[in-house]
Regions:
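Amphipathic alpha-helical packing segments from all-alpha helical-bundle domains
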Residues: 124-151, 161-164, 191
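Hydrophobic/aromatic residues within well-ordered alpha-helical segments
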Residues: 14, 57, 64, 68-72, ...
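N-terminal intrinsically disordered/low-complexity leader segments
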Residues: 1-13, 205-228
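Helix-turn-helix
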Residues: 17, 21, 25-59, 63
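Hydrophobic alpha-helical connector segments
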Residues: 63, 67, 77-107, 162-166, ...
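Amphipathic alpha-helical segments used for helix-helix packing
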Residues: 102-127, 175
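Amphipathic C-terminal alpha-helical segment
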Residues: 99-103, 117, 143, 147, ...
């Protein structure tokens, strides 16, 4: 007879499977056009089995976003904990964001649908989850910025305003990359953005140290130029 621990492991594994299958269906058909039966068919199970784990399609949709954000937050925390220098920490955070967006590039429509659904839905859990994650990212960004200011790498700046602006820029770069057909490396776009922001916020002394790398990026850009 299976023990309670084994039953929980099986249930957790089944739940993860259903989330993975739901991602495929939502990506293919869109959230609103997808039915629980579609997900059941894709998973090769009865529709009733899904309801043992998720009461509604909305609950399953939220579980998909939760899974992605939990993984993203864990990766961000790991990046912060692995570095003591704020400069290398900032680089690690950017690398983590790039990796997340590249991993979920094919699911961009789901992310956009989630944001749109959060604004329309009467269920406040959707918008609360987005705000929760954004607040966490803003907290990390603020902490790093404060350390860069203390290190005299950055000039004085309103930390909270800058952290919020960074969140919008980050999402915007990802969206523009998708709209541009992923025609350039996302990493190059992020590094260019890093140079633009750095050029404005770096102290005079630190700007001199970083000038060769920063100026090179600013001149080259990230969009491949057509040969004349």
């Amino acid at each position: 007879m299976p023990r309670k621990g084994e039953n929980k492991e099986r249930k957790d594994a089944k739940r993860e499977l259903l989330i993975s299958v739901a991602v495929k269906v939502f990506a293919r058909k869109g959230f609103h056009a997808s039915k629980m039966q579609d997900i059941a068919d894709e998973a090769g199970i009865g529709k009733g089995t899904i309801y043992e784990y998720f009461k509604t399609k909305d609950e399953l949709f939220l579980a998909v976003y939760d899974k992605w954000m939990d993984d993203y937050e864990a990766a961000m925390n790991k990046a912060v904990e692995s570095h003591s220098n704020p400069i290398t920490t900032a680089d690690a955070i950017i690398d983590t964001a790039i990796e997340f967006y590249e991993t979920h590039a094919e699911h961009a429509a789901i992310l956009l649908e989630f944001w749109a659904h959060a604004l329309r839905s009467d269920d406040t859990h959707f918008l609360e989850r987005i705000c929760q994650m954004k607040s966490k990212l803003a907290e990390i960004g603020s902490s790093i910025t404060k350390k860069l200011i203390k290190l005299k790498a950055f000039t004085e700046v309103d930390v909270e305003s800058f952290a919020r602006l960074e969140l919008g820029i980050s999402d915007g770069i990802f969206l523009q990359w998708i709209l541009d057909g992923k025609s350039y490396p996302l990493r190059d776009a992020y590094k260019f953005r890093q140079s633009v922001i750095g050029a404005g916020l770096m102290t005079t002394g630190f700007r001199k140290v970083m000038s060769v790398k920063t100026n090179k990026r600013l001149k080259e850009g990230f969009i491949k130029k057509k040969k004349k």
